[in-house]
Swiss-Prot record:
Entry cofactors: Ca(2+); heme c
Function summary: Catalyzes the reduction of nitrite to ammonia, consuming six electrons in the process.
HAMAP family the UniProt entry points to: Cytochrom_C552
Family, as annotated: Belongs to the cytochrome c-552 family.
Family matches, as Gene3D superfamilies: Butyryl-CoA Dehydrogenase, subunit A, domain 3, Flavocytochrome C3, Chain A
Signal peptide feature range: 1-25
Protein name: Cytochrome c-552
Domain of life the protein comes from: Bacteria
Amino acid sequence: MEKKLKSWQGWLLSGGSMVVVFVLGLCVSALMERRAEVASIFNNRKTVIKGIEARNELFKDDFPREYQTWTETAKTDFESEFNGNVAVDALEKRPEMVILWAGYAFSKDYSTPRGHMHAIEDITASLRTGSPAGPHDGPQPSTCWTCKSPDVPRMMEALGVDSFYNNKWAAFGDEIVNPIGCSDCHDPETMNLHISRPALIEAFQRQGKDITKATPQEMRSLVCAQCHVEYYFKGDGKYLTFPWDKGFTVEDMEAYYDEAGFYDYIHKLSRTPILKAQHPDYEIAQMGIHGQRGVSCADCHMPYKSEGGVKFSDHHIQSPLAMIDRTCQTCHRESEETLRNNVYERQRKANEIRNRLEQELAKAHIEAKFAWDKGATEDQMKDVLALIRQAQWRWDFGVASHGGSFHAPQEIQRILSHGLDRAMQARLAVSKVLAKHGYTEDVPMPDISTKAKAQEYIGLDMDAERAAKEKFLKTTVPAWLEKAKANGRLAQK
């Protein structure tokens, strides 16, 4: 016997069905409107761009949301327990680094990084780039510009890649004037993600890989891997090269450099041929759980936002800790405080090893100098220098990566621990050399408790360095900008 619905039940079911259909209709309508708006943006662009366009302001009218959030990379209002977007003098906090970089420009100046909009400003103001008096003067090659501006691909196209690299940094001061922006990651005509720097493409080719076959999700990391990687300047032409031929690990790259007989500088105290790590962010991220699970850089550093019915990537690229509700909590259900402390716990533990390693390594350099002064021979010091080189490479590789102790905490702790082991082995080896020369006491240690004291110990004249840079910023840089404006390299305000 069939059970008939009561009248009110029928009306309720009918009304409920209508509500469901209405809500679904609204969802479909909203989706269609959103797609239509996105399509409208591309089909009715106010500014038609052909070829390479370095002036970020020209994308503002067609992509106002992305442009506005990109300008927020100029902010200096966030500090976590470790880094943020505020420039902090790292040498003042950890003066042992002055000793580790003795004989290299980083011993003069090293601060925590700021946002992309400060890229040109910060490299120009850094003591590391010196105070060149003319286009053929100065300590750095033009290769140093490579990751600082969308003007770089324009200059590479105009001059050729080899010719661009094989110049002085000051040669292009009036050409490279727009900070990291739109065309670095996007094809200016289609706005698709693209690779604008040749070094990444070349690294893939040497590994037998075709970067054009990367998936859209992979591209959300690969555009970052154009710059946030380990690299070196190869040969007299200072050709930017990624040492990935043997693999991504610290040992793989060390083997690559050793085989090539490469070093960045000879240490002023210990005479060690030192490898200076850059910032192997992409490589280390691939070794952590997020990278292994396919999470991209943009997923956490450029989370999606919705505004006016349009979903877009937040171009305020910054630490995910500044927006945990839109980054970590997209996948993890824990509270902001818990998630923040999860990150800090990993960083603190890695930094315990880092701090000890910096202390031991600084002593190893000083003790090696003492051994040379006592008459040690090159043959006697061979093993000492090899151990110092290995220890410092592991230290620098582990600390130069921004966020590495979160991206791959186990790998970073492994690397730093191996570095500490080699630093202590180096000190033991030095003591044996000294014993052969009749010295068995502790090596006297200088006072390097502050940046200023450490810089004085290694012979830097910081007053002269700062005075020269101040003059350079007041005279040369304004002239660069005036010429850039006259040549149309900067957008008119």
